């Protein structure tokens, strides 16, 4: 039995122990919340949550925004601008300070959600889609910026970001179901509430996140200081390097910014060559898993309907948001798992996701799965696979890519998820229509009984 006391170990005292008291608990929790590492994890968790939650809410609201139009239309408006942002921005965004980027992202996302919420149902869907596009640009720029920022804060920041993005899916889909189905709020009211969320990003960056590593970037001299020589960094194994970044002190921050300073001198051709090296090990499996899962979500899921008397729902429009909730629950669990479970072979879960797409497409056509609850399990499994590939892809980059290339690589690889979703959006527009027509032709007209909810 160790003789280390709770107070010296940082653990909370056991209830009933002599050292336990309400004041002791409060003091210990306050110390934990004030710790540098805790602030980093909380800040990046909130970055991931807020940057992605509006995207999820928009997709959850797709059926109510466009009614009988293919949901892939909303998916494309929600993803293509983000994809183009991620495709172009890595070559110049390093010139924009992180503080300025945060303010831009907040303004774009809030304006986009207000435009979607305040556009009357009687007006053109195109106006709503413009608002979706603004939010998409913000999300794309935010993702590549925050993932690049994890380079300076280490593995725990990536764990916080991954868990936050997973929580965004769960919170976004869950909130929309709660607002519209449980509380009976209109779509407009639900989206207006959502437009307030970007303010949390401001608090996360300017209040919670320790800005010491960023302030180091204002120095003109980025040479590593004597207690951490360049030679030491170059010969340090990746696991040790990652651990050293766990709680970046001045020397680690200086080294990180030295690498960034070297990267800023690279030409566009140099950066494109670096992207080519990322494609097969990291970008391709991420692309494949996103093509498969978002084709399921937007092209197949709207047609995965059952007779209402055999389901827990009162109307057909309730299937789609609940599928989204289960999917996002799986994503949240798997994106929060990297401290305990690591996936090094990224192609295996990608292939399993493609198998899910084939299975659910066949069921949409031939209706052979015995219960909607079986579909619930498959959709949850789909979320586990998708979230696992996402967070483990960036964890592999953080471990295996040299420090001088890491910030750029983390940001550049984000183009794969948006690229995959864009491809899925195009496929979904065709697949949803074809599957619905096939079902109607074979005596199942449930997909035609869904209309947009009044705002």
Curated annotation (Swiss-Prot):
**Gene Ontology cellular component?**
vacuolar membrane
One GO-annotated biological process of the protein: amino acid transport
Q: Out of the domains of life, which is the source?
A: Eukaryota
Membrane-crossing segments per the record: 40-60, 73-93, 102-122, 129-149, 159-179, 191-211, 286-306, 313-333, 346-366, 367-387
Q: How does it sit in the membrane?
A: Multi-pass membrane protein
Keywords, in A-Z order: Amino-acid transport, Membrane, Transmembrane, Transmembrane helix, Transport, Vacuole
Q: Which cell locations does it reside in?
A: Vacuole membrane
Q: What does this protein do?
A: Involved in vacuolar transport and vacuole pH homeostasis. Also required for cytokinesis.
Family to which the UniProt record says this protein belongs: Belongs to the battenin family.
Which protein, by its recorded name, is this?
Protein BTN1
């Amino acid at each position: 039995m160790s003789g280390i006391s709770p107070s010296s170990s940082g653990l909370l005292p056991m209830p009933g122990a002599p050292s336990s008291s309400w004041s002791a608990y409060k003091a210990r929790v306050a110390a934990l919340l004030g710790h540098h590492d805790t602030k980093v994890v909380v800040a990046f968790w909130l970055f991931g949550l807020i940057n992605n939650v509006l995207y999820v809410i928009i997709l959850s609201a797709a059926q109510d925004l466009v009614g009988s139009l293919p949901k892939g239309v909303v998916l494309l408006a929600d993803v293509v601008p983000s994809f183009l942002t991620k495709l172009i921005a890595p070559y110049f965004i390093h010139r924009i300070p992180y503080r300025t980027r945060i303010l831009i992202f907040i303004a774009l996302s809030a304006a986009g959600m207000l435009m979607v919420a305040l556009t009357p149902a009687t007006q053109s869907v195109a106006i709503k889609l413009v608002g979706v596009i603004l939010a998409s640009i913000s999300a794309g720029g935010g993702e590549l910026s925050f993932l690049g920022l994890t380079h300076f804060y280490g593995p725990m920041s990536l764990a916080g970001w991954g868990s936050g993005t997973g929580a965004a899916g769960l919170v976004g889909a869950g909130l929309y179901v709660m607002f519209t189905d449980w509380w009976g709020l209109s779509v407009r009211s639900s989206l207006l509430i959502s437009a307030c969320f970007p303010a949390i990003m401001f608090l996360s960056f300017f209040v919670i996140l320790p800005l010491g590593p960023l302030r180091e970037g204002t120095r003109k001299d980025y040479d590593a200081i004597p207690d951490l020589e360049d030679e030491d960094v170059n010969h340090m194994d990746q696991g040790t390097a990652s651990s050293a970044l766990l709680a970046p002190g001045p020397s680690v921050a200086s080294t990180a910014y030295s690498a960034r300073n070297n990267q800023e001198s690279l030409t566009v051709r140099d950066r494109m060559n670096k992207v080519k090296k990322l494609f097969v090990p990291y970008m391709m499996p991420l692309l494949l898993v996103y093509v498969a899962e978002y084709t399921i979500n937007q092209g197949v899921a709207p047609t995965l309907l059952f007779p209402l008397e055999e389901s827990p729902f009162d109307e057909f429009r309730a299937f789609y948001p609940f599928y989204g909730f289960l999917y996002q629950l799986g994503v949240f669990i798997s994106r929060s798992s990297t401290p305990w479970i690591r996936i090094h072979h990224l192609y295996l879960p990608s292939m399993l996701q493609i198998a899910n797409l084939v299975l659910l497409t066949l069921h949409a056509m031939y209706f052979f799965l015995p219960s909607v609850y079986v579909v619930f399990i498959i959709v949850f499994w789909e979320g586990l696979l998708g979230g696992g590939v996402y967070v483990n892809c960036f964890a592999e980059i953080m471990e295996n890519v040299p420090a001088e290339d890491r910030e750029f690589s983390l940001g550049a690889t984000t183009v794969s998820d948006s690229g995959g979703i864009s491809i899925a959006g195009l496929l979904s527009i065709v697949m949803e229509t074809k599957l619905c027509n096939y079902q109607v032709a074979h005596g199942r007209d449930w997909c035609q009984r869904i209309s947009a909810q009044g705002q």
